[in-house]
Each structure stands twice: as C-alpha cells, then as structure tokens.
Amino acid sequence: MNKRFQGKVAVITGAAQGIGRRVAERMAAEGGRLLLVDRSELIHELADELVGVAEVLTLTADLEQFAECQRVMAAALERFGRLDILINNVGGTIWAKPFEHYQEREIEAEVRRSLFPTLWCCHAALAPMIEQGSGAIVNVSSVATRGIHRVPYGAAKGGVNALTACLAFETAERGIRVNATAPGGTEARHGGFRNSAEPSEQEKVWYQQIVDQSLDSSLMKRYGSIDEQVEAILFLASDAASYITGITLPVAGGDLGCQSCSVMFSVSG
C-alpha cells in the first residue's frame, strides 16, 4: 500500500464516524501518526480498532469552543512533537427548513456547529505549522452554499470557503497549504437530521426536497460514497498536492455549489 503519510502527524476532527472516520482509517494504514478528536465517546472505539496499525491518540472535545481547540493542538504537540496535517471535519446540518422558520438560537447553533470548529482549529494549528515552516490544512465544506432549506448552514460553509482562501493567501509563503473539499450528497450511515427532536411530517418533506435538489444538481444524478469524498481529502493533504493551495474542490458529481454562480457572473460580466 502507498505510504503517503509515513511519519506525518495529523489531527483529524469529527473522526468518530462517517467521512472523518474513514480518513482516519486510511491515514493510519498509510503510515500517519494520528490525534483523533470527536465530541462522541465512539472515538475511543476507533482507537481500539487501530491498535497495531498506527500510533493513535484520541480525545473527546467540544470544538465549538476556542479553548478546546487550543487544548487539542497542545495535546498533539505534547505527544508527537509536531503537526503536519489538520483535517477539519466537524459540521453538519442540524435543521432543514425554509429560512423564515428558523429561530434565532437555531441560526446561531448552525453557524457555531459548521464554522467555528474549523475557524478555531485553523487558528490553533497555525503556530506550530509556522514554526516548522510547513503544514497542510484541509477543511471539509459543502456544495450546500447554494441550495434550499439550509440557509444558516450554507452561510457557515460559505465562511469555511472564505477562511480557506484567505488563510491560504496569508500562509503560502510560510510553507503552509490550505484547501477545502465541498462534498455533495453523500451516502452515510448517520444521515438526515442532527437534532434530537422527532421530525414532523412537514420537516420530512423539506428534507426530502433537499435530497431531490442534491440529485438534480449533480450531473451524475446520484449520491457519492464516503470513499469518494475521502480520496479527495487525502489527495489535498498529501505531498502530491504540493502546488495546490487556496482552492475549494467540489466533490459532488458535477455540482459546483456556489462556484457555479461565480463562473456565471464572471462570464456575464
């Protein structure tokens, strides 16, 4: 097997399940030394599975809090002595409904879930990467920056895209690359709503409209697999992408998300 990450130290957030878990499994198999973070205790089960495969440290943390992100990066430095790769994978739609139906607390919760963990972790990772003169950051965004029933989530992920571009400008000459992937609809075991309430019949209809739009927007007319998302993340994190920084790569079967709007405006202008 290719050992693209031999000896590299990577922090992977949101690693207990889904895309983050598969990234961790693949990096471990390819020689990475990993600090895996999630708010769920399931993260420790993954560490047990990777015993004998890679050197792994797991932490539970609420990465919506600035201090927790600082604690995670400090733990990585204490254990491994350096930080080569950061994969920011925390986020996800909590509610799915037209914007006028959101309450203030729900809007704030969506932004806090899908923007702040990435913002805080990028900030916390900068000092060791700048000191080393190298590093690769991959932020997991979304093509949902253009779509229905997820305006606060789309705004948060739009912030991730802007963070990616701006931070790449600031850090490129210091040897740090910053990129993002923008997944489209993706088959996952834990899809759908991410709040504890039982969805109403109307909420189920709204969510199905998101699914239908995702399929209609994709040229391939299907959902992607977790492995298809992971391949893009691993590529951007690896040395094979050494001349790539500041991009948000749509991985959505041809759906470009908000980038399609930018292309349209630039052509018409």
From Swiss-Prot:
EC number(s) recorded for this UniProt protein: 1.3.1.25
Oxidoreductase is among the record's keywords: yes
Catalytic reactions of this protein: (1R,6S)-1,6-dihydroxycyclohexa-2,4-diene-1-carboxylate + NAD(+) = catechol + CO2 + NADH
InterPro entries: BenD (IPR047686), NAD(P)-bd_dom_sf (IPR036291), Sc_DH/Rdtase_CS (IPR020904), SDR_fam (IPR002347)
Biological or metabolic pathway of the protein: Aromatic compound metabolism; benzoate degradation via hydroxylation; catechol from benzoate: step 2/2
Record keywords: Aromatic hydrocarbons catabolism, NAD, Oxidoreductase, Plasmid
GO molecular function: 1,6-dihydroxycyclohexa-2,4-diene-1-carboxylate dehydrogenase activity; oxidoreductase activity, acting on the CH-OH group of donors, NAD or NADP as acceptor
Binding site for substrate: 142
Keyword NAD carried by entry: yes
Residues reported in the UniProt entry to bind NAD(+): 11-35
Catalytic residues (UniProt): 153 (proton acceptor)
Alphabetical GO biological process terms: benzoate catabolic process via hydroxylation; fatty acid elongation
PANTHER family on file: OXIDOREDUCTASE, SHORT-CHAIN DEHYDROGENASES/REDUCTASES FAMILY MEMBER
Family (UniProt): Belongs to the short-chain dehydrogenases/reductases (SDR) family.
Complex and partners: Homodimer.
Function: Degradation of 2-hydro-1,2-dihydroxy benzoate (DHB) to catechol.
Name under which the protein is recorded: 1,6-dihydroxycyclohexa-2,4-diene-1-carboxylate dehydrogenase
Organism: Pseudomonas putida (Arthrobacter siderocapsulatus)
